[in-house]
Amino acid sequence: MNSKCIDLKHDFSFAKCVLVEINEPVIQLHTHKFDEIAFVLKGSGIHEVDGDRYPIMRGDVFVTHGNQAHRIVEQQNLILANIIYERKHFQEIKGEFKELPGFSALFVYEPLFRKNQQFKAFLRLSSRQLENIKMLISQIKEEQEKRHSGAEKIVEYVFRQLIVKLCRYYHKSDNQSTKGILKISSAIDYMEKHFADKITIETLYNQINMSSATFRRTFKNITGSSPIDFLIRLRIEKAAEMMRKKPSIRVLEVCYSVGFENSGYFGNKFKKIIGITPKKYIKQHL
């Protein structure tokens, strides 16, 4: 089998999201500039993502980010329905649904931290749930095939319905790994919103009703990082983004704007994470 990774492309001129039915899964390792939701409609197989392999079966739903090298390496009567969507379209959807319970966990953090979770926090639909999802997929398929006026709008509308359904199912899951990533995604979302504020471990575990020890352990298991290290990296990434957007900004202003109280500590962490000092970084983007 050829293990060379290829970059797949797709034309989104019809709609911002497209249904692709797959009866013969791609076994070539590949990436792409779009993201996808895969629905296992029938059969079973082995899905490889970034070098790790996971069993998949009927009812499984998983999101794959396009920069993750992936392929199907084994399959038994496997039929997939993939909905692929442009990343800029996802940013629009993210703005709409970020507050929807289960959205960040399913679409952002489960794919991002899948390696740490060993695919234990994926979504597996019940037979009834799968039938509900298949009805929405059929609507998208019909609109794509007939292409009557306004078909692309209906496709994008039904796609949003599908996202809401998936998030509801994910949020109600009894899977313990899923419950863990739902909790931790809420803590990360809180960090994203309040990174400039004073945030303590106590602030975070109280937000999600966990004990300190359980929160620290669960966060580390899922993200591979301690909560504080994660917060520091997030703040540094926000600082770098601020500098790129406004190269005339003063380092001290950036420091305080992203939640640091000591400029020396900020400078040390910035250099450790980004690789150069804040001043040099700003000069690069003048």
Positions of predicted regions on the chain:
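A hydrophobic/aromatic-rich effector-binding and dimerization subdomain
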Residues: 1-16, 69, 73-142
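Conserved short histidine dyad/triad with adjacent acidic residue
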Residues: 16-32
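Tight coil/turn sites that cap or link beta-strands
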Residues: 23-24, 58-59, 67, 88
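Short, conserved beta-strand element in jelly-roll/cupin
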Residues: 31-47
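A cytosolic small-molecule/anion-sensing beta-strand core signal
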Residues: 41, 57-58, 66, 76
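Short acidic-glycine-tyrosine-enriched beta hairpin
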Residues: 51-63
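An amphipathic alpha-helical interaction segment
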Residues: 115-175, 182
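Basic/polar phosphate-binding segments, predominantly the helix-turn-helix DNA-binding elements
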Residues: 165-171, 190-238, 249, 253-285
